[in-house]
Amino acid sequence: MPPKKVKEVGPPPGLDASLNSELSAAGCMNYVKLAEDFCDMDVICVPTGFPQLDYILHDKLRGCPRGRDVEIYSKEPELGKTTISLAFLKAFQKARLRTCYDDVERTMTLQYLKDLGMQIRPEENMEQYAIRLMRHEDSVIPAEVWLDTLIKLCGIMDLVVVDSVAALEKKANLEKKPGEPNQVGGLSLLLSEFYRKNVAKKATILWINQMRTKIGQYSPNGSVPLDTTGGKAIKFYSSIRLELSYVDKIRETKDGDPIGMKIKVFTSKNKVAPQFRQAIMSYIFGTGFSQHFDYMDAGLKNEIITKKGSWLSFGNWKAQGPLNFHNLMREDAELFKEIRIMVDGEDSVVAENVSQGTKPEDFEE
């Protein structure tokens, strides 16, 4: 006896109209089928110009995802949290995107921005892409007022850098008299409220955070556990969390003064690409993270640059030691260009990001 045919049951007629009607009555937006071209779900990345950093941010699209939250923190001070955030700003600015730097700590100087190669004075007809610097000179802005301003900025800007979360303070704590206790957990509640209000934002928010010891908590080995400021809201809402840690000093000679540091950038969280990846970046004092060092390290990993003993070579170029080869790359633009093309690759996804509004020369340091 032949098996009975199962009657296919499709969706009831008018299902989409009924759902839209019910959602509209409840004050919600219309739903969208996943089968349709839902472009808001696509991840669009902006290359930072540092191949190793781009890889750990997104191993396929290579760059910082737009419209997401990124948190940068470290256990120790002076490891380049602000400097690496300015590298993100520089990349977004070169990609013809609107950027804003919120100097909550009031420590940024114009000379430091110039030393890092930031474009202070925009080109003709490019005023909208100049970096906006937010700073309140007279007193500290209450966190309540600042977060309301940030919500408005997220609807205008493409990238907002907050430096830093630890400098934010509630109005009640600012107005309290000496000796009165602080309100515990007030900032974490405000940040949770901020994320609930800021559901329609399209800007990338880059949070710079610091770590503090947890009061009253101890681990079995006797050390005090550390945690970032501002509660757990940023921790959960961020798509990417970058932890910076010290690796080694960079010296011109064995007994010479340090000219920089090797910094490990570790993705402790990544919701758009595989997490728990790391990149060793070179931070040069006064000039920021070195793009030449990053391409040299990427070239060594991919065996584009040959290393025999202490000598590094690429084609007809040769130098003894990584620092000398780095200096050779800085002096010879043709060498750096060829290594950059080899590292990025002709078929790399970086080229696809270029077609979305940036130019190839924008990735040069």
Give residue spans per PLM region:
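Conserved inter-motif catalytic segment of the P-loop NTP-binding fold
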Residues: 75, 87, 92-184, 189-193, ...
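The Walker A/P-loop phosphate-binding site
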Residues: 2-128
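Terminal-proximal interaction/regulatory segments of ATP-powered molecular machines
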Residues: 310-365
